[in-house]
Swiss-Prot record:
Naturally occurring in which organism (per UniProt): Buchnera aphidicola subsp. Schizaphis graminum (strain Sg)
Protein name: Large ribosomal subunit protein bL34
GN (gene name): rpmH
Gene3D superfamilies listed in its UniProt record: 1.10.287.3980
Similarity section: Belongs to the bacterial ribosomal protein bL34 family.
Key word Ribonucleoprotein present: yes
Single GO term (MF): structural constituent of ribosome
Cellular component terms (Gene Ontology): ribonucleoprotein complex; ribosome
Length: 47
């Protein structure tokens, strides 16, 4: 049986990346919450 998780960096960044988060109001809210928690990585695309 084929596994469900087939990793793709491009798809990952397009759905969860920084620019995608910044594009919507809710995405910006997520980033603000992560900043408030002092997360070192705000999104999956940030190094």
């Amino acid at each position: 049986m084929k596994r469900t998780f087939q990793p793709s960096i491009l798809k990952r960044n397009r759905s969860h990346g920084f620019r995608t988060r910044m594009a919507t109001k809710n995405g910006r809210y997520i980033l603000s919450r992560r900043r408030a928690k002092l997360r070192t990585r705000l999104t999956v695309s940030s190094k």
